[in-house]
Amino acid sequence: MISRQSRVCSDAPSGGSEPSAGIGAVPETCTVLPTTTARENPATGSNGECPEIKRRSISGLVSRPVDALRQIDDWDVPFAVAGVSRPEGTVATRGDTQSAVRLASVSKPVTALAVLIAAEEGVLDLDEPAGPPGSTVRHLLAHASGLPFDGTVPIGQPGRRRIYSNEGFAILGQHLALRAEMPFDEYVRAAVCEPLALALDPAGHPGAGMHACLDDLLVLGRELLEPTLIAAETLAEMTAVQFPGLDGVLPDFGRFTPLDWGLGVELKSGKSPHWSGSRTSPQTFGHFGGSGTFLWVDPVARIACAALTTREFGEWAKTAWPRLSDAVLAEASRG
């Protein structure tokens, strides 16, 4: 059984920021910002001004995608922050990198990483039963369990269709807690947050309720480029197509044949249009969230890019995110 002990949970203050309904309190080092549906303030920084781009001098980088990040100044959102990282560290950021927002579905890769750590530790097996009859942990991670977006009554047979399911990740969280014999959020803190020194708060829905700041996501992106918490072979399995050939609907983007998915991460493969833009490689993986968040990792370009906003995903993001992503890669490729 897992030998890690959660220090984050025991050290958490009893007061501090008030949590959103159903969501645990966020560490005092983070300022939690609400998600909105429209522009409330032209600022992209929490102080009402646009923080300057922060550069990190990293040996060996041929180019730093700095100018590309200025695009977020033109986004019609109350708050925006974006950044780029490589395995060596963070390349550049623009905006307030320490204010936390709800990640929405960007929570799913965090949960997936915790589940994969548990699998390596022998806490659970990816192919053990979990969820509806015939489903396994692997099915739940890959949205192939037959469960609907919400609700516990299956609408398909496991392994037959790619049905995007928040409920599947709720069940994953329960299953991990049962097998680890500790609360889900405590396991994530001990297995993921503490080793990576993240302020990320894993309380709430395992597939939609976590809070984090940009600094956290950029560290997570580096971890998914060069893992330290899981073996390289496990990362390869995470980013390989699970149950190949399944058709499905990518939320807000439509039907794809096939709709490739890994273990808790969406795989770009041949999808077009795609929220990560046209310059990212087919090997790119990651997730976007309905609260206006995204993280993609391109193992070919060796770059991770993330953005957090407080405006719900919509048509604005379908244009803004690919444009930003393409500019980041274009600038990074220039020697």
Regions found by a protein language model. Name each.
Residues 68-69, 82, 88, 102-127, ...:
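Active-site SXXK
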Residues 3-10, 14-20, 27-30, 35-42, ...:
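Low-acidity, Ser/Thr- and Arg-rich intrinsically disordered low-complexity segments
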Residues 109-113, 143, 168-175, 208-230, ...:
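Active-site-proximal alpha-helical segments within enzyme catalytic domains
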Residues 102-106, 118-154, 163-164, 178-207, ...:
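Active-site helix/loop module of the DD-peptidase/beta-lactamase fold
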Residues 246-250, 314-335:
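Short, gly/Ser/Thr-rich active-site loops of penicillin-recognizing serine hydrolases
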Residues 95-98, 155-158, 169-170, 202-206:
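Flexible glycine/proline-enriched surface loops and loop-helix/loop-strand junctions
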Residues 60-103, 114, 142, 266, ...:
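A short, well-structured edge-of-sheet supersecondary motif
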Residues 205-208, 212-214, 240-300:
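Active-site Gly/Thr loop motif
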